[in-house]
Design a protein with these regions (language model features):
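Phosphodiester-processing cores and adjacent nucleic acid-binding clamps
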Residues: 1-157
Length: 157
């Protein structure tokens, strides 16, 4: 529980949504167990919370079921590596509805299935541009795809 106290405000009235929560399903990025998120959300009356594990949706069902039981609105997301030209970087994606959820499942799966076993999981950025109905796409960080393009002076591409 100590980790959660560092990530969330002390106030019991939530004025923001934490959109980049990583669980134990984000290898080397998160250690928070979904049961702990459930307990924390209940005790702090968190209105909504997003799970955004990297390259997978393995915890999405468990998260949605457990968080919903305590009155917190689950927001399902993931961050996936996208390739644009010779640049690769993460973009956080969030499901706005069931169609968006199915879309990010497909993108997450494709990131593993459509690459050779020697490359890191990624999806061509054009695949996201071609079909993103029901998906909220965030810019990520300076280490994300858009940050990489900006840092290399290629953002206008």
């Amino acid at each position: 529980m100590v980790v959660l106290k560092l990530l969330m405000p002390e106030s019991s009235s939530q004025n923001f949504n934490h959109l980049k929560m990583h669980s134990q399903y984000s290898i080397c990025e998160g250690a928070v167990k979904i049961d702990d998120l459930q307990d924390f959300s209940k005790s702090n009356k968190i209105k909504s919370l997003a799970l955004c594990d990297t390259s997978n949706l393995c915890g999405a069902l468990e998260f949605a079921e457990k968080i919903s039981k305590v009155g917190t609105q689950p927001i399902i997301g993931t961050q996936i590596n996208f390739k644009y030209g010779d640049n690769v970087g993460l973009l956080p994606l969030f499901a706005l509805n069931e169609e968006g959820y199915k879309r990010i499942i497909k993108l997450s799966s494709n990131s593993f299935l459509e690459n050779d076993e020697l490359s890191d999981p990624h999806v061509d950025f054009n695949e996201l541009l071609d079909d993103n109905i029901g998906v909220a796409i965030f810019s990520g960080t300076v280490f994300g795809l858009f940050g990489e393009l900006f840092n290399k002076g290629k953002f206008s591409e």
